[in-house]
Amino acid sequence: MAPGTGRDFHLHLVSDSTGETLITVSRAVTAQYAGVTPIEHVYPLVRSEKQLDRVLAEIEEAPGIVLFTLLEKDVAVRLEARCQEINCPSLSIIGPVMQLFQAYLGADTTGRVGAQHTLNADYFKRIDALNYTMMHDDGQHVESLEEADVVLVGVSRTSKTPTSVYLANRGTRTANVPLVPGIAIPRQLETLKNPLVVSLHAAPERLIQVRQNRLLSIGAGPGNEAYIDRQSVTEEVIHARRLSVKHDWAQLDVTRRSIEETAAAIMKLFADRRRQRRPD
């Protein structure tokens, strides 16, 4: 954005790691300018010439400031050269700092991509996700469902809790809410805007088998006939599917899926949704 031409500008953040360093620095600087709104374009994991081609094409389509953290010298040099050709200001955020350290310490860098994130980002993201997930297991604390990344719903024994924990271990805040016959779903579940809601389903035969094993493991006595009755379970499944269609929830059949496979499918849905919501 040239001086006096407007208050919005394109900001391209190119990283060979997560991009978190660039985002933090650029937002800290932008905050010093009242009324200025950057249109962020974040390109993580750029480590090859082919990946850089896509980045350069987008920079040329929407010129602006280019900030980068690239340890691969050839990729960084090419990015800087092309930015100069199209009159886009560019700056390596880590480069000057590394030069200062190298001059003072008299030592070479390890060149390890993303080393600064080994503990802080990944570790604390997982801890936060696990804390959230444990607090929001089995329909607890529905008042803060909006803070989730993913909300899993489903009838009993559709692997909601183990899948939630698996996702949380990968840094995804996950809540789960049971769909119980005769009990209305929480109103908060009907108005969610941020989280991806995924309805987990399984074949009635599979649910009956898992539920029978569960009753045996806890030594349950009489009074659980409806829980494993074929007609009742089939009606549960049909009701859950109807709810999913009504509320436009994503649906996933977990009948023959392991926890890992279910989690992977959910993460793909989550990634696809984020791409669709990304502004052009």
UniProtKB/Swiss-Prot annotation:
Coiled coil feature spans: none
Highest rank taxon of the organism: Bacteria
Name of one Pfam family that matches: Kinase-PPPase
Keywords associated with the record: Kinase, Nucleotide-binding, Serine/threonine-protein kinase, Transferase
Family to which this protein belongs: Belongs to the pyruvate, phosphate/water dikinase regulatory protein family. PDRP subfamily.
HAMAP family for this protein: PDRP
Name assigned to this protein: Putative pyruvate, phosphate dikinase regulatory protein
Protein's organism: Nitrobacter winogradskyi (strain ATCC 25391 / DSM 10237 / CIP 104748 / NCIMB 11846 / Nb-255)
Highest classification ranks of the organism: Bacteria, Pseudomonadati, Pseudomonadota, Alphaproteobacteria, Hyphomicrobiales
